[in-house]
Amino acid sequence: MFALSPDAAQPCPADPRHQQVARARSLVFGDQALAGSPPGIAPWLWRSWQRCLAAGRRPDERVVYEALGPHALRQTRDGHEVLLQAARPVMAQLVGAVGAMHYFSLLTDARGTVLEVQGPLERNDIRVQAIARVGVDLSEQGVGTTAIGAALAEHGPVWLHRAEHFFEANRHYSCAGAPLSGPDGSCLGMLDITGVDVPERPELMHLALRCARAIEDRLLRALPHALLLHLNWPGGPLGQEGEGLLAVDAEGHVAGSNTLARQLVPQPLSLPGQPLHCSELLAMPWTALVDHARQRPNEPLRLPLWSGLRLQALVQPGPQPVSYTHLRAHETS
């Protein structure tokens, strides 16, 4: 177990940005009631501070970094093996981009427990040792406002620098984070980029988001599927990073989709576990998709939606063979 105390944290630099954060902290953590976020503070950051205060926490508290025991850690990692396999290559590429700046990368589950650590680590620095450990709890409930807790709570990418952390003991850290969604749209965890006493690099939020999307795409492609639809608006790139992906199984049911595909093709509300056929999303027969994948897998297809909007798509065959029994049933229905 590691703990950091406020007196271990040095004052932040006296530039205008840090002075603005300092003024915001005095307003939020003082006795003055605020109806909304103070000037210069993002609404999501103010909400996180408010949640910490509502939980009875104080900024000057000692921060304890609790970790799972060996048995619980083994169970947690075993339960996320597919996520780990998808994330490790992407994290290695990420570290190649930021390692020279002394940033490292963390992968957590949906509760904020660290599953994987990659990058250059100063093992003699207790501030690095405290967080760069598999099994440590970095949730908002555990360690206050961080990119990890905020990304999970807000379901979006964040950047957090020094004194923007709730606890004064955490003001050495700078971190970017983005949530990770599974092929069914559920939150699986988040990807974090953290440095200790490093220059501010808010652009890392975009890198974290890009890498999180790459992990989601790897998870989707690993699903058994008969067709993979690459989706975009007309004129947008296809077959490249940053596109929508929709996987369809051998019977024409949606096996999964990435975040962009769920935005391009909104899915109707349905009961958990209830299959959703692609014909409920796309205003064209499933048989037409199968034929296009067989005959013209590298040729874009105009894809009508029931809303009247149109997308363009590449429809490519997957490793799973199409069920011809279901295909004939759709041809005659």
Report the location of each language-model feature:
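PAS-family sensory domains
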Residues: 44, 54, 114-149, 207-209, ...
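Regulatory sensory and allosteric helical modules in signal-transduction proteins
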Residues: 66-100, 104-105, 109-163
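Sensory modules in modular signal-transduction proteins
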Residues: 87-106, 221-265
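A short beta-strand signature within small-molecule sensing/ligand-binding domains used
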Residues: 170-178, 309-313
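Sensor-regulatory modules in signal-transduction proteins
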Residues: 180-182, 305, 318-320
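Short beta-strand-to-loop transition segments that serve as allosteric relay/switch motifs
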Residues: 190-199, 318-319
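Amphipathic alpha-helical "output/dimerization" segments
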Residues: 202-214
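Conserved small/polar residues in nucleotide/adenosyl-binding loops
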Residues: 325-332
